Amino acid sequence: MQTTWQPTASMEQLRQRAALITAIRQFFAERQVMEVDTPAMSHATVTDIHLHTFQTEFVGPGYADGSKLFFMTSPEFHMKRLLAAGSGCIYQINKAFRNEENGRHHNPEFTMLEWYRIGFDHHKLMDEMDDLLQLVLKCGAAERMTYQQAFIDVLGVCPLEGSMQELKVVAAKLGLSDIAEPEEDRDTLLQLLSSIGVEAKIGQQVPAFVYDFPASQAALAKINPQDIRVADRFEVYFKGIELANGFHELDNPKEQLARFEQDNAKRLDMGLKPQPIDYHLIGALEAGLPDCAGVALGVDRLIMLALGCDHIDQVTAFPFPIA
């Protein structure tokens, strides 16, 4: 029986990958940020309607009827529990799992770098991330723009004040009428316009930080106290690829629980199953999360760009089709 057993990345690319990951660890060691290790599975998971999880079942002593477990889409919830327990600034390089796309820039199992800095807001974290990107990508300093500015400059529409009909007109100009016209959820429509219309136009020469996302897309970020229309959230793009997603972290347990419950209500409206809420995280927030900012970065995509490759299979040994 013939089989494709060889890695898709060359040995030289894998050596360069290892060197870059070593450099990332050194970056955090120099800043006295502690590396941590948290579970790949959990009894609860994310409620975000746009994230899809893998799940399995444990059957063993004390669990004769089985216990459902979810593979983590991010180590965020566990890392925040460490922060609340007094860990100080922390980072992690881990495997994350998302039951979504597989292709040029996606693999269901991928390597993620996530870190949290106590006493930072999202702007100060962008400063630090810019330093890391310049180190790994050998690029210039990043450009920065608000979410509102990016939409107005690229698409000519305001994402905060434009009507659904105005957004759909822009979608039609992008050839997206079939998808956009029946869409009733504003944030889904905005994400479509961002991914197809905005992301390909920004961050071509240097990375682009986009910040102040709509408050309805806050997820686990604080609402901006100076402008409650927006959240203290940012994303990073380079050469048409989303690299990272960061927050000035929400520390209000009641507000976080309400957001999880709102997500699950929206899931039911969409015909999706509600997800089990992580009450361990809520308990950590009740105990007290220190004021901090955090970000999750896709390591495979970062290395792909650093090495001048155009497919993540070129920088991962055994991608999904041959795993």
Swiss-Prot record:
One of the Pfam families matching this protein, by short name: tRNA-synt_2
EC number: 6.3.2.-
Gene Ontology molecular functions: acid-ammonia (or amide) ligase activity; ATP binding; lysine-tRNA ligase activity; tRNA binding
Domain of life from the UniProt record: Bacteria
Sequence positions that bind ATP: R98, N99, E100, N107, E242, L243, G298
Keywords attached to this entry: ATP-binding, Ligase, Nucleotide-binding
One annotated GO biological process: lysyl-tRNA aminoacylation
Record-annotated disulphide pairs: none
Catalytic activities: D-beta-lysine + L-lysyl-[protein] + ATP = N(6)-((3R)-3,6-diaminohexanoyl)-L-lysyl-[protein] + AMP + diphosphate + H(+)
Subunit structure: Homodimer.
Its biological purpose: With EpmB is involved in the beta-lysylation step of the post-translational modification of translation elongation factor P (EF-P). Catalyzes the ATP-dependent activation of (R)-beta-lysine produced by EpmB, forming a lysyl-adenylate, from which the beta-lysyl moiety is then transferred to the epsilon-amino group of a conserved specific lysine residue in EF-P.
Family per similarity comment: Belongs to the class-II aminoacyl-tRNA synthetase family. EpmA subfamily.
UniProt-recorded name of the protein: Elongation factor P--(R)-beta-lysine ligase
Organism from which the protein derives: Vibrio campbellii (strain ATCC BAA-1116)
